[in-house]
Amino acid sequence: ATVWGIYPKKDVPTSGNVFTFTLGDATQSAQKAELQNTMHMLAKGTVNGTTVTNLKFEHLTALYQFKFTNRRPDAYKVTKVVVSADAAIFPKTLTVSGEEKTYGDKSNSLTLSMTSLDMAKNEVAYGYLSFFPMADMTKDTELTFTATIEKVGDSSSTETIEKKGKISELYNAESVVAGDEYKYVAGKRYGIAFMLVADLGYEETEAGKYLVKKEDGLINLASEPTVMTNAATVITLDADLDMSTKEAWVPVTEFKGILDGNGK
């Protein structure tokens, strides 16, 4: 006799050895991956008396892992990520009958909504989204990953970060995707990284050397203890700075004296 194993368990009995699984847009709270209801698996085994043998589960879904890194001075939160394509390559249903898999209710996008996914400066956060991989994808399939973020405590600061390109552009030749002929495969995880970068007003031209481009750049550098306490740090201006409007830089008293520029 044949026995079937299904994960996660179904409350409604399945008849005729035909199994239907559903996926759609997902919601994640904080950094807890809500995968227990979306990582669908199916197994077929044999019953010998009271023993079940050869029961091996097959993954039916693949997984996006979104990595967010906040390099901005303020705390930010991610509210959602949308994966979209020109073609409808994201099915919401999968029906398995014997060796045959049939995908239905295809869409050109999937959405992961997130609550309480906050990141302080330099913190990293992750989001997870399960999906049914299809054979329709090729190296020329264009995908767009759009993350919506906002500053913590300021709902009016909403903005988006976008990563877009052909599959062959988003994943290099050494990637798992390239090894699978630029197709997503069930049971595998695919990483997509987003970086929240701020215009700090300065750039590090080489180790320990900084070029300040505007007033905020000098203020931001001054707030970096590892930079300011390093005797080898060299800070150069590429323009005159007017600090008179910067409250954080108003001197408590007037300075008078001679500045020793080391002869330069």
Q: Which stretches of residues belong to each language-model region?
A:
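Conserved SET/PR-domain catalytic core that frames the SAM/AdoMet-binding pocket
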Residues: 60-73, 82, 216, 255-263
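Short, surface-exposed beta-strand/loop "edge" segments at domain boundaries and coil↔beta transitions
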Residues: 11-17, 74-75, 88-92, 138-139, ...
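Surface-exposed repetitive/solenoidal architectures
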Residues: 199-264
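Short beta-strand/loop motifs in extracellular/secreted proteins, especially
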Residues: 74-81, 141-143, 233
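Short, low-hydrophobicity acidic/polar segments
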Residues: 1-77, 123-128, 133, 146-153, ...
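Solvent-exposed serine/threonine-rich low-complexity stretches and specific carbohydrate-binding patches
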Residues: 92-120, 164-169
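Extended low-complexity, serine/threonine- and proline-enriched intrinsically disordered segments
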Residues: 76-103, 147-149
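Extended serine/threonine-enriched, polar tracts that run as long, contiguous segments within proteins
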Residues: 83-84, 112-162
